[in-house]
C-alpha cells in the first residue's frame, strides 16, 4: 500500500497538538490518492486539497515559530484578523482541507469494514457515496453535487483501486485491507483532533461552495 504507508501520519502527543510541519509533510502526499481512481473526473477534489495545502504552507512559512502547530495558526489568525476570522487565511483553508481528508478517511474505513453493494461487490460506489455524504455533500450546492454524481459513474472497480493504491503491484485484497487499517490509525486520530479543535474554537462554517 505504498501510496498510503510511505508517508504515514505520526502519532499525536497527549495534548493533541498537531505539529504543522509534520502535518504538511504527510498531507502533501495525499493528492496522489485521487490518481488511484483512474479518472480525471475526481481532479476537482484533488485540486481543492492541493490548493488548501499550499495556503496553509504559505502561512506557516511566513513565521514557522509562531505557527508551530495547527492550533497556533488558528489562535494567531483569530487575533490577527478579528471579526473576519474564521473566513480568512489558513483557518479557512484548513477548514476545507479537513473535509477532503475526512472524505478519504470515511471511504477507506468503509472499504476496510467490508461495506459493499451485494449486487455489485467489486464496485466501490457505495464507499465513495458514503464518504461524500458524510464529509462533503452538505457543503456543496446543487451544481457541485451533480458533478459528484457524474464522477461516480467513472468510479473504478475495487480490484483496480486497490492495485493502484499498491502502485500497480498485484497484492492480495486481505493484505491491502490490512495496510489501509494501519494507515487509518494515526490518520483518523489527526482528523478527529482537527474537527474537535474547530468545534472548540467555533471556527466551523456551514456555507455551501
From Swiss-Prot:
> What Gene Ontology terms describe what this protein does at the molecular function level?
lipid transfer activity
Please provide one cellular component term from the Gene Ontology annotations of this protein.
cytoplasm
Q: For the region 2 X 12 AA approximate tandem repeats, give the residue spans.
A: 45-66
Keyword vocabulary terms for this entry:
Cytoplasm, Lipid transport, Repeat, Transport
Q: Which InterPro entries match?
A: GLTP_sf, Glycolipid_transfer_prot_dom
The intrachain disulfides are none
Repressor found in the keyword field: no
List the Gene3D superfamilies hit by this protein, alphabetically: Glycolipid transfer protein (1.10.3520.10)
Residues noted as binding beta-D-galactosyl-(1->4)-beta-D-glucosyl-(1<->1)-N-[(9Z)-octadecenoyl]-sphing-4-enine in the record, renumbered to the chain? 48-55, 140, 207
Enumerate the Pfam families for this protein.
GLTP
Superkingdom of the organism of origin: Eukaryota
Q: Where in the cell is it found?
A: Cytoplasm
Q: Please report the residue spans annotated as repeat (sequence).
A: 45-55, 56-66
Q: What does this protein do?
A: Accelerates the intermembrane transfer of various glycolipids. Catalyzes the transfer of various glycosphingolipids between membranes but does not catalyze the transfer of phospholipids. May be involved in the intracellular translocation of glucosylceramides.
Recorded family membership = Belongs to the GLTP family.
Q: Which PANTHER family match?
A: GLYCOLIPID TRANSFER PROTEIN, GLYCOLIPID TRANSFER PROTEIN-RELATED
Q: What is this protein called?
A: Glycolipid transfer protein
Amino acid at each position: 500500500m505504498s501510496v498510503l504507508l510511505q508517508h504515514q501520519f505520526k502519532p499525536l502527543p497527549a495534548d493533541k497538538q498537531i505539529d504543522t510541519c509534520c502535518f504538511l509533510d504527510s498531507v502533501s502526499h495525499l493528492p496522489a490518492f485521487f490518481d488511484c481512481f483512474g479518472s480525471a473526473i475526481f481532479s476537482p477534489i484533488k485540486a481543492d486539497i492541493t490548493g488548501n495545502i499550499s495556503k496553509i504552507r504559505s502561512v506557516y512559512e511566513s513565521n514557522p515559530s509562531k505557527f508551530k502547530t495547527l492550533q497556533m495558526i488558528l489562535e494567531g489568525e483569530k487575533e490577527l484578523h478579528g471579526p473576519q476570522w474564521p473566513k480568512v487565511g489558513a483557518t479557512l483553508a484548513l477548514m476545507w482541507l479537513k473535509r477532503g481528508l475526512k472524505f478519504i478517511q470515511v471511504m477507506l474505513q468503509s472499504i476496510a469494514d467490508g461495506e459493499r453493494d451485494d449486487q455489485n461487490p467489486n464496485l466501490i460506489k457505495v464507499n465513495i457515496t458514503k464518504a461524500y455524504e458524510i464529509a462533503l455533500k452538505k457543503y456543496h450546492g446543487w451544481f457541485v453535487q451533480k458533478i459528484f454524481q457524474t464522477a461516480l459513474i467513472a468510479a473504478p472497480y475495487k480490484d483496480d483501486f486497490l492495485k493502484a493504491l499498491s502502485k500497480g503491484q498485484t497484492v492480495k485484497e486481505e493484505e491491502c485491507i490490512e495496510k489501509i487499517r494501519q494507515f487509518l490509525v494515526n490518520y483518523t486520530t489527526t482528523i478527529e483532533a482537527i474537527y474537535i479543535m474547530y468545534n472548540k474554537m467555533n471556527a466551523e462554517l456551514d456555507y455551501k461552495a
